[in-house]
Regions:
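Conserved N-terminal/central alpha/beta ligand/cofactor-binding core
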Residues: 2-90
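Residue-level recognition of phosphate/Mg2+-coordinating polar/acidic sites
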Residues: 20-23, 40, 46-64, 113, ...
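Short hydrophobic core segments
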Residues: 97-98, 110, 117-130, 138-139, ...
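A conserved FAD-binding loop/helix module that cradles the flavin
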Residues: 122, 126-133, 137, 340-364
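Glycine-rich loop(s) and the adjacent beta-strand/alpha-helix scaffold that form part
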Residues: 122-164
Length: 364
């Protein structure tokens, strides 16, 4: 519930319309095939209809993110708490489970931190991004656990001049990590610590394991223009023709802010006094190269607001995809982020939680 209350900056980005999703692989780097099946049984539309039946109305942003019209995550929390109360669900807060033991015959024993033990017919683990070490100590030892690492974060960069552009937003960029084959595109935000925004968050998700192995230090290539180098050359040629008498720093690409354009000109070695008419081929090529392949350095990561997503968890080959039941231990089920499923930002992680939970409920 605590995690639900902070998602979407406290507004609860409950799901996504999926209207702009070309491939589920783009939004679910891990768990793509499972999500294809689950979304057929319980889609974003099914989720919204379920909550609307409880009196909650929703609004969808241009980017597909869905929020309650109240813009208040607590409305969702209160709704779920009410439904649990009406159904007789007993909620034990501050109660920690240390171990789950399979007793056979569909029975499991929970060992609590205070020493108590209780037996249950069915156990559903929905603990979120729990560490792999804790999962290994809590679950039966024959269940495969994929190591957990952070998968949704922003980047610390080493370029101080870039950080001076704090607050700059570029609507369409392409990011890549040279030598890895990993890339992303989207809106990029320059912050006082480095880079954020959808493009950076997507890249952090796609490259979660790669960056963890590199201890969050890696080269970063930024395509500020968001297009090919040939296309940029054509744009620059037109700019030079139309603005031949103007200073290069004062007549740049309209989609880039004046501050960013001046920064990129300076990085390309173009003087503040240079006019377009005087810009030679070498300087033009350097400018185009900087626009399309600006080299920066990732030197660390920063958690995205109060949201913390991990990749890893219970390996997907350990569960039955129809109802999320553990293949080796009948009566033990897993939902949400405790599984090795994670997504980019935009409501997709919550949808995975809703869809896996529905699969369990339908199977019980």
């Amino acid at each position: 519930m605590a995690k639900l209350a902070v998602t979407g900056g406290g507004r609860c980005n409950i799901t996504n319309s999926f209207e702009h999703v070309r491939s589920l692989k783009d939004v679910y780097p891990r768990g793509t095939n499972l999500m294809k099946r689950l979304l057929k049984s319980f889609s974003a539309n099914d989720l919204l209809a379920w909550f609307e039946n409880e009196g909650i109305r929703f609004t969808t942003q241009e980017d597909g993110c869905v929020f309650p019209c109240s813009q208040d995550a607590m409305q969702i929390v209160r709704c779920l708490e009410r439904l649990m109360s009406e159904s007789g669900v007993q909620l034990l807060c501050g109660t920690r489970v240390l171990k789950i033991t399979d007793l056979g015959n569909h029975r499991h024993r929970l060992t609590f931190a205070d020493g108590r033990e209780e037996d249950f017919d069915n156990v559903i683990l929905s603990s979120g991004g729990t560490s792999a070490d804790f999962l290994r100590s809590m679950l039966p030892h024959d269940i495969g656990i994929t190591p957990t690492v952070p998968s949704l974060f922003t980047f610390r960069t080493g370029d101080d001049p870039l950080k001076s552009l704090m607050g700059t937003v570029v609507e369409h960029t392409r990011l890549s990590i040279p030598g890895s084959g990993i890339s992303s595109e989207g809106i990029l935000l320059v912050t006082d610590w480095g880079l954020s925004g959808p493009a950076a968050l997507k890249l952090s998700s796609y490259a979660a394991r790669f960056l963890n192995e590199k201890q969050y230090r890696a080269p970063l290539c930024i395509n500020w223009a968001g297009c090919t180098e040939n296309e940029v050359h054509e744009e620059i040629a037109l700019l030079a023709e139309v603005n031949s008498k103007k200073l290069v720093v004062n007549a740049g690409l309209s989609r880039l802010s004046t501050r960013l354009w001046k920064h990129l000109c300076q990085k390309s070695g173009i003087s503040g006094e240079a006019r377009w008419a005087d810009l030679g081929k070498k300087a033009t090529n350097k400018l185009c190269s900087t626009l399309c392949a600006d080299n920066e350095e990732i030197i660390g990561r920063v958690n995205f607001k109060d949201e913390f997503v991990t990749c890893g968890g219970v390996a997907l080959n350990e569960i039955n995809s129809a109802d999320m039941e553990c293949k080796k231990h009948n009566g033990l089920y897993f939902t949400g982020e405790v599984l090795d499923i994670d997504a980019v930002t935009g409501g997709f992680n919550l949808q995975a939680a809703w869809s896996t939970a529905f699969a369990v409920a339908a199977g019980l």
